[in-house]
Amino acid sequence: MIAAMAVPGRPSSFGHSFGPMAVVPSLHYAAGRGKEHPLNFLAGYQGRFLQCDAYQSYNAMTEITRDNGPWRLIYCWTHVRRRFVKRFENEGSPIAEAMLRQIALLYQVEKTVRGKEASVRLAARREHAGPIIAALKPWLEAQMSRIPQKSQLAEDIRHTLAHWPGLIRFLNDGTLELDTNPVENQIRPIALTRKNALFAGNEVGAENRAMLASLVIRRENSHWTVS
């Protein structure tokens, strides 16, 4: 697995491998996607927030006992958006279309404060994104009475509501992000070549590949010369 974790004050995100990240990801190999891997990897780390997709293994992070308290999961609005994009493209759902418009409004708020101090981001979010979020949850709940409960759209709405606390934590902390895009963009070259690395020979080979991939990404971000 390759993942990215941030230092305090930076967002954290897990993809398909595990590793610490200050400015760029550090990639580490794990033999699977079970909960033991993020638990072991982050043992001893005193961060508070873990930004991730909704993969169920990360739920275990909220149940552990630490001096700093359990991890607080921050979920990704881009992953939510993808669900409703699919519903709109495949079914032409007006509910999905309306949901996409609301998500777009959240990102418009983010665009105005991108790169600014956390306090500025937090103030803008509370003023402009807060009312959108406040109206969005009851609206989603109301849509559930209008659609078949076994439909995929109903499942997408249930999924969104089930992860609501982690989706709205960005309203209370200006250092958090709406999504995992910063990390996903960093590890995209690795993800695009994953089929070329299905057979690493053994676990040592996989660990070495993760280490080399980390160096390549760091070079791209730091303009190092590798010889």
Regions of interest found by a model, annotated:
Residues M1-S227:
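Catalytic center-proximal scaffold of phosphoryl-transfer enzymes
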